[in-house]
Structures are given as C-alpha cells and as structure tokens.
Design a protein with these regions (language model features):
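Metal-associated gating/positioning segment near the N- to mid-region
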Residues: 72-143, 147-149, 222, 250-254
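Histidine/acidic residue-rich metal-binding segments in metalloenzymes
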Residues: 140, 192-280, 302-322, 374
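His/Asp/Glu-enriched, well-ordered alpha-helical/loop segment
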Residues: 98, 233, 306-393
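C-terminal cap of metal-dependent C-N hydrolases
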Residues: 368, 381-418
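Histidine-centered divalent metal-coordination motifs
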Residues: 71, 81-87, 211, 241, ...
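Active-site gating loops and adjacent loop-to-helix segments of metal-dependent hydrolytic enzymes
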Residues: 85-108, 165-182, 274-305, 319-322, ...
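Histidine-rich, glycine-flanked metal-binding segment
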Residues: 29, 34-74
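Histidine/acidic-residue-rich catalytic or RNA/ligand-binding cores of hydrolases
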Residues: 88-91, 138, 218, 248-254, ...
Length: 418
C-alpha cells in the first residue's frame, strides 16, 4: 500500500496536466513546408489537437489565452536520430562494449526519462531513438511518456539494431561471447534479417535501424531489400547507418528510406539518393563534440568535422532530402544532452544551408521520413498540437532556435518564458 501511494505521489509530481481549450495568439506563424510567414494568427487547440488556424478565429468562452503576439511560432521540432538512454562521455564507452556492461537497463531507462523532459523544453516535441537503448528500454520510455506518467516528447523507437555478426562492438575476445546481443541482433542471411525485423516489431519498434558497414562485413543489396520488404509490409521505415562506398550503394538500391550519417558519400551516391528518394539523416557533429570523443581525425587533408560540413553542403546542393538528426551521445558537467543538441544548428549554418531548408528538415521532412506527417510536422487543423515559439525569425537566423520561449506538447503548455 505504501509503495502504491509513493508511486502515485511521484507520478503526480511529474505527470502532464490535463489538456484544455487554448487560444494561441501568434504574432508570426511559420509554415516550414513553404517557408512562408503569416502574421497575426490565432491557433485554437482542444483535446490535444489543433482545431482552427486563422486571423479571425474566435476562441470559445472560457478558453485559455496564450499571448505570443511578439513571437515567431512554428511546429514542434523533430530530431530523427537520438539515443536518449546513452551517455558516452566516458571515452571507454566509445567502444560500445562497455556502456551496457557498466549500467543496468533500469539505470539507463531512468536516464532516458531524465533526458526526455529537458529535450522537450529545448523544442524537440518528437524524437526517434535509433537503438543502443538498453534492451528495448526506450519502448517503455515511449509508453510511459505517451501515458502521461512523465513529461517528454513523443518517442519513436527502432528497438535493437540489426547488424552483420558483431554489432558495433569493435573487438570482443571469443572468451567473452557475444556481449553485443544485449543491444544488437546478429543477422547474416536474408531469413535472419527478416526474423530480426519481426522480432523488433514484436517488441514494439516503430521503425527499423540497421548498420551496413561497421565491420569487415557489409550488407548486400538483396539483404537490405529483404529488411525493407518486411518492414514496409508492417508500415515501418528502414534507416541504415552507413558511411559511403559500395555499402551505401547497396543501401540506396536496396530501397532503404534513409541513410544515417553518410560522412563519406560521394557526389555520385548523393545523386543516386536524390533519384531514389533516399533521405539523409545527416547527424552533423560539431567539431568540438568530435574532439571530446577523439573522433576528429584527419584523412586526405580534411578533418572529420570539415568532411561533415562539406558532405552536408554537397547533399543540399544536389537536392537530397535532408532530415535533421543529432546522434548526440554526450553529457558534460556544465551542459546536458539537450543543451548540446542545440550546437548542431551551427553546423548547418556553417555549411551554408538556408534556414528555410533547415526548418523543413526539422519538421516536414522528418515527419515524412518517420511516417507521422498526417499528425505532426505542420500547424493545421487536425494535427497534434505540438507547437514551439522563439523570440525572433528563425528564417533570418537559425540560431534563434536555441532560445525557445514556448513549448506546447499535445495541447499542454509545458514551457512559457515570455
């Protein structure tokens, strides 16, 4: 009985308040799909959804008024590549064999919930967790947040990462056995790949994540196609971690929905991505983050950080569909993961990506890739009321997204600093 009362008290302290009818008076409303701005709009929200948008919308009696008349309002932001349960600030954990040996699933699930509220407060109302999630812990984090037990974004999950033998464990001695199976599924034939997709779906995955080239082995076109066929039959997109080269070609021609990272993609492969409609979730690490992880190595006269910027610039110029994703796995004593995620906007600026294109990558494009475009990614009647606001025009300077002053999640105001 005491435990039940204690749990009730804890949930009462952290749970979202019930939804209410709210009228938001937006000084400027941004439509990322078109890059246009309309002034003096009223957004009416009821039961967690947007019910009306326009300059002359009349709020019903008793509706709560939210004055954002001096702000710029836009759809909630989406990070399509996160690891909310991970902290790889300890360089030993970069080898992805020690994090899940040192920490229990329970500890990492608690970290994920701790991160979730902070991530929402900086403007990300939806994130996709792409594995390394402590044995499906992110699935239960998603359910806890969806049930309103805790405050956080909508979390979409991929479950365990499907890989050729060995996962991303680098080098584990044969005496230790396949330690990586806590977070990866070894799948080395078409049948094993299909079964791995089915396993993830069974345990609650809403998307599929594969690693194509993290070892001496990489997936063939037919193997990628098998995963895509199985996932698409269940309505799930497939995203694949790959650098470039022949492995990337197999990913594109195998029909994957997106490439994650792609730091070594050539112009030829980027052009092929455009032709096939393969999105790039670019995970554009800032150079100081790479240095903290000892990953900013130089090859062919170019550091990885510079290579990332160059690849992003070329992808945009060629017309590849860009989707924003951070892959932020760090925590620092003075800065939390959510705050570090904001540094990625600077990379897009340094690559010369127009703010309108970046906003589209953060909303519309991400929603389409995640197959949630019918409920998220735009501000329109019938859409989920995931809304953020900033103090000035992000189309002029993307960096203002670091200064989110208002967050609404599913019709509930969770942050208002204006």
């Amino acid at each position: 009985m005491f435990a039940h009362l204690l749990l009730t008290a804890i949930l009462g302290l952290t749970a979202l308040p019930p939804p209410e009818t709210i009228a938001i008076r937006a000084g400027a409303l941004i439509d990322p799909a078109s890059g246009t701005v309309t002034k003096s709009q009223v957004i009416l929200v009821s039961n967690g959804k947007i019910t009306a948008v326009g300059p002359s919308v009349t709020p019903p009696a008793g509706a709560r008024q939210v004055d954002l008349s001096s702000a710029w309002v836009l759809p909630g932001l989406i990070d399509a590549h996160t690891h909310i349960t991970m902290d790889m600030s300890n360089l030993d954990d970069i080898m992805l064999g020690s994090a899940y040996l040192r920490e229990s699933s329970a500890r990492r699930a608690l970290r994920g919930l701790w991160n979730a509220e902070a991530i929402l407060n900086v403007g990300f109302t939806t994130v996709r967790d792409v594995g390394n999630d402590a044995n499906y812990a992110a699935v239960d984090i998603r359910r806890a947040l969806a049930n309103g037990w805790f405050i956080g974004p909508t979390v979409l999950t991929t479950g365990k990462i499907i890989t050729p033998f060995g996962g991303q464990s680098q080098r584990v001695s044969p005496e230790q056995g396949p330690l990586w199976l806590f977070e990866y599924i070894d799948a080395d034939t078409v049948d094993e790949i299909r079964k791995a997709v089915r396993q993830n779906i069974y345990y609650g995955a809403q998307a599929i994540k594969m690693v194509a080239d993290n070892s001496a082995f990489y997936y063939t076109r037919d193997e990628i196609a098998a995963a895509v066929a199985e996932a698409h039959a269940a309505g799930l997109p497939v995203s694949v971690h790959v650098g470039g080269g022949e492995a990337a070609r197999n990913v594109i021609l195998g029909g994957a929905d997106s490439i994650e990272h792609g730091f070594q993609l050539s112009d030829e492969l980027l052009q092929l991505m455009k032709e096939k409609g393969t999105a790039l979730v670019s995970t554009d690490f800032p150079e100081d983050h790479l240095k903290l992880m000892n990953m900013n190595e130089e090859t062919d006269g170019m550091t990885l950080g510079r290579r990332i910027v160059d690849r992003l610039r070329r992808a945009h110029a060629i017309g590849v569909k860009l989707v924003f994703g951070t892959d932020c796995v760090l925590e620092r004593p003075d800065r939390r993961k959510a705050d570090l995620m904001l540094d990625y906007y600077d990379v897009w600026k340094s690559a010369g990506i127009p703010s309108a294109a970046a906003l589209k990558a953060l909303t519309v494009n991400a929603a389409e890739l995640l197959r949630i475009q019918k409920v998220r990614g735009t501000i329109a009647p019938g859409m989920a009321a995931d809304i953020v606001a900033v103090p000035s025009n992000p189309l002029d300077d993307l960096a203002v997204l670091k200064k989110v002053i208002f967050v609404m999640k599913a019709g509930r105001v969770v942050k208002q600093s204006q």
